[in-house]
């Protein structure tokens, strides 16, 4: 019998977002999350594929959506064949018994290429030597799963811990992506690129990442779903040590790390430095082109469109292992099902330097065209189907105008002609960008306290100047570096006002610590955080950061920020054209201001707008019990207006 522990829990607590939902009153109804002490256990026969006791094990449980909850949870159900997983593990073990080589330190040793198996999985021979995998007892004939535990339900995939009967009860991590996208090509590209990127980080950069044992990019394998099988690392997340809003007695960043006046900075810096070390390692090698990393022997790639000579710095025994192919940047694939995959691939790279257009300009241009083509396809589909939703069609037409402007301005923002920016040539070199560089994705191994980087999904190679700061330290609001000098009347303010300014200070402080750590490790690249550079790349980052249809307004806002600063940029050699490339009428300026205000009002007045209506399950349960969240007649949930003093 197979034992299946299922652990129910949420990984994060969200700030309240709503004019009608007061944080103070809500938080009185919410207790700090406690990880369940003991997982629920279910026993099942491995061969009994119809055992109803398994169903809960595959269902999404870490949150509830205020709208369309069942639909959202169904998309995150990760049902797979346990028997199929067992057969894959046993097949891997058979391969491992024939492989005693477990290290490839010398550049004269050829590292074996990924192996495509008859069961339509791909195994990694360099990671499955018998010395790494473990052995069976003499009286056992095959690998058997003993327990499976659901340990994490993330934004994009679910993670299971699989314990086997191999020596020392060898465990593995099984990652299964959610079927959030309408086409299989999205998941296929992401998995194939992520595995190749992890392999690159392991072999070329010598970084600590979980080794991939086996993977499948589609559902035609024994598990019946795409998956990645990795080594299991026993440890705890670095996120446990990260408290971004911790109190800071000095209320000033200048005191520095380890100061007796402000010892709290040492705690924050411990996390920041660990993340900055990974960041520096990712940027320790530059590439000859941009895109995403794949294996050269990937049969699903179009050999005519990939770039072979990806870098001049590769080890001699690894030069024929990887190529650059289509970018898997999330926004470039998200909600693009109305556009045929063949059409999408035209604008996904890879991109290489040419005499007329820099890599950066090519990426900006193609990103804009891709969004434009997708919006046009959506509009055509709506009109063809005779949709009566004229508001949506009007909105899409506004998006089309926005993306046309991004395409128009794409060649005027970032180039080697920006002489006023120090080390501009270095900033334009493509390096690896990790979109989820976050303490949540760093595991500290228990025995050695070695940090391992997890989850490289969506990683891309692109110019450093186009890379934004990690989200865990990102802050675009007003900066406060020293509460005493920047806010001299601080002590006279109300408690609510003081908390507001302290919040801005803490966000400023965290960003400052990050930029300081980057400067210490990559001083030639620090200009990427300079305010003018951020403004120049803002149209690009605003496109990538879109979460809802109305976020095109934020892309428009980047144009107006640029227009305001353009004369200054030209005077100081940051741009080459004297005239701002876009023109707007007074009516358009007024309309944008109205649209931007409406968008901000909607974000402020809509509870949990920042998470598109998703609420962590423990918070949801507490708010339901408190009468704050109520189920309506349609099956959706509404948030009650409650008394702040209650």
Swiss-Prot record:
Coiled coil: none annotated. Gene3D superfamilies: Phosphorylase Kinase, domain 1. GO terms for cellular component: mitochondrion. Its main location: mitochondrion. It comes from the Eukaryota. Residues 1-34 form a transit peptide. It is found in: Mitochondrion. Keywords: Mitochondrion, Transit peptide. Belongs to the AIM9 family. PANTHER family: ALTERED INHERITANCE OF MITOCHONDRIA PROTEIN 9, MITOCHONDRIAL. This is Altered inheritance of mitochondria protein 9, mitochondrial. It comes from Candida glabrata (strain ATCC 2001 / BCRC 20586 / JCM 3761 / NBRC 0622 / NRRL Y-65 / CBS 138) (Yeast). The gene is AIM9.
